[in-house]
């Protein structure tokens, strides 16, 4: 197995390289009779598309998606849905000077050691270009989840500077180039990233993804936990080096009573939580609260600043990477994180239906004895 697929029942296989003729994915396990067209997928690709501001790569890709199979008469047929996105703006010559050199912090040397051969053009298979296919698959996953489920992502930290949570406003996310929910932070980030970009360097970031409208009961103990699948999905995104669910690492500093998501009864007999430190998941199973995931994205490895490295002959060299690269790859990771959240939730929904049917006990009020 080459590990180019993820998911259990809703299973996505991606293919293609950064500078190949096209990239794409095959989405298996899509239920039949779901309305689907390219128009349902394209808006999500447009949010991730490169070249939309000076803060992202200037590679100009239209990212137009084509559905090749699995849809007839405007609805899914239950067979694999194949999607293709053409690459139209490659500049492979930009990578000629690093064909035999390994970029520090990049997958170059790891791919070389594993396979004995690699595609240096734009990073080949390890390029963030691959994530466009995940966004396309995520659009299909959203169709399975339905309109009741809302998935939103935001950049909550760039470099050392985090947002002010008191100013968190989801309406601000699509009003700036950073998917930032804090307008003041967005202004400060613009100044800082301009300086970093002009210096030929890059910054890391933290992305937060929140899913609301999730029914209780998704996920299963012990090896199909919802949070385990979410962590694996987010960690599979290029440049991601850490993931947390809910309070995550901050929970280690809390006492037990502080970390507890206390509960009370509503008048209709349903349960309400007084907090959400767990991020909507307990015991690997959704609680009905918002599912909250954050992931850390390292600074872009391809930078103009000269750094020390080695080449394939074993000589020590200095390397300066030309080409068009994101000064902060975390920005365009926001729609990718949303897509991975959607894929995992759709997968877990199908697994839940397979075991428990359309409804589970979590939808019912607690009966008083």
From Swiss-Prot:
Pathway: Metabolic intermediate biosynthesis; chorismate biosynthesis; chorismate from D-erythrose 4-phosphate and phosphoenolpyruvate: step 7/7. Keywords: Amino-acid biosynthesis, Aromatic amino acid biosynthesis, FAD, Flavoprotein, FMN, Lyase, NADP. It catalyses: 5-O-(1-carboxyvinyl)-3-phosphoshikimate = chorismate + phosphate. FMN binds at residues 125-127, 238-239, 283, 298-302, 324. GO terms for cellular component: cytosol. Transmembrane segments: none annotated. It is an enzyme of class 4 (lyase). CDD domains: Chorismate_synthase. Its EC number is 4.2.3.5. Homotetramer. Belongs to the chorismate synthase family. This is Chorismate synthase. It comes from Acidiphilium cryptum (strain JF-5). The gene is aroC.
């Amino acid at each position: 197995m080459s590990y180019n697929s993820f998911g259990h029942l809703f299973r996505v296989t991606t293919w293609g390289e950064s500078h190949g003729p096209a990239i794409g994915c095959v989405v298996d396990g899509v239920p039949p009779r779901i309305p689907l067209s390219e128009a349902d997928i394209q808006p999500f690709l447009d949010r991730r598309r490169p070249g939309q501001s000076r803060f992202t790569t200037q590679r100009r890709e239209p990212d137009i998606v084509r559905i090749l199979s699995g849809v007839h008469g405007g609805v899914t047929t239950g067979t694999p849905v194949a999607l293709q996105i053409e690459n139209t703006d490659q500049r492979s010559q930009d990578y000629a000077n690093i064909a035999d050199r390994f970029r520090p912090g990049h997958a170059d040397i790891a791919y070389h050691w594993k396979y004995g051969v690699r595609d240096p053009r734009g990073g080949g298979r390890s390029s963030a270009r691959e994530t466009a296919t995940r966004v396309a698959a995520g659009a299909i996953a959203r169709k399975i989840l339905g309109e009741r489920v809302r998935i939103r992502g935001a950049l909550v930290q760039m470099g050392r500077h985090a947002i002010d949570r008191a100013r968190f406003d989801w309406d601000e996310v699509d009003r700036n180039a950073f998917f930032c929910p804090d307008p003041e932070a967005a202004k400060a980030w613009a100044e800082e990233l301009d300086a970093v970009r002009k210096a030929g360097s890059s910054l890391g970031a933290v992305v937060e993804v929140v899913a609301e409208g999730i029914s209780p009961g998704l996920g299963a103990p012990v090896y199909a936990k919802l949070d385990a699948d979410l962590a694996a999905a987010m960690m599979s995104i290029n440049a991601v080096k850490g993931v947390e669910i809910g309070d995550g690492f901050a929970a280690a500093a809390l006492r037990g009573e502080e970390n507890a998501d206390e509960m009370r009864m509503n008048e209709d007999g349903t349960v309400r939580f007084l907090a959400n430190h767990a991020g909507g998941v307990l015991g690997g199973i959704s609680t009905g609260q918002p599912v909250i995931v954050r992931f850390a994205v390292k600074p872009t490895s391809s930078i103009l600043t000269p750094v020390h490295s080695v080449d394939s002959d074993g000589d020590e060299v200095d390397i300066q990477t030309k080409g068009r690269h994101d000064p902060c790859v975390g920005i365009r990771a926001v729609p990718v994180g949303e897509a991975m959240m959607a894929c995992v939730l759709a997968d877990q929904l199908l697994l839940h239906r397979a075991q428990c049917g359309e409804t589970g006990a979590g939808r019912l009020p607690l009966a008083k004895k």
